[in-house]
Amino acid sequence: MAQAQSGICAEANLHGLHLFFNVFDGQDESLRAKLKQVSAIEEEFSDQFSESMLSCMVAIGAQYWPHILPEYIPSELQSFPNINHSDHQMSVQPCDLFVQIRSDREDVNHLFALQILKLFAPDVELVEQIRNFRFLDGRDFNGFIYGGDTAHGRKKRATALISNPGNFEDQG
């Protein structure tokens, strides 16, 4: 049965770190092997710092997906759109990989990020890193207040999963 990454369905944390990467040419196979190690590193950190409630998520950009897993491209996969609204503007900065790290301890996020950077080197370029936090009125890591239509529990997990004929870790 398919399982969501821990960061997909985790509850809000106090601290977070977003890492945006671009992959250097010719590093696809090397990076593919390294991506399989992220969950083991997360498990190790979760055991060592259990009180931190660490979670992690790795997202592969729509433009990079065919390089890393060409045999299975989800039908729903698309690039993040530009969002222009009178109150908000979110412009797109395409990247190959996005790593979201969240926990209740900023030091654990920092240490975990160092492990990710060490793991991915020299295959990637860190384009940007953004520290984030839980705001006073309980906003989520993106700065939005959860509305009544936000999925919770099993519905949240069902919404998060894509139909996949196999596990990513089983793919080459």
Please name every model-derived segment:
Residues M1-G172:
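Long, histidine/aromatic-enriched segments associated with O2/redox biology
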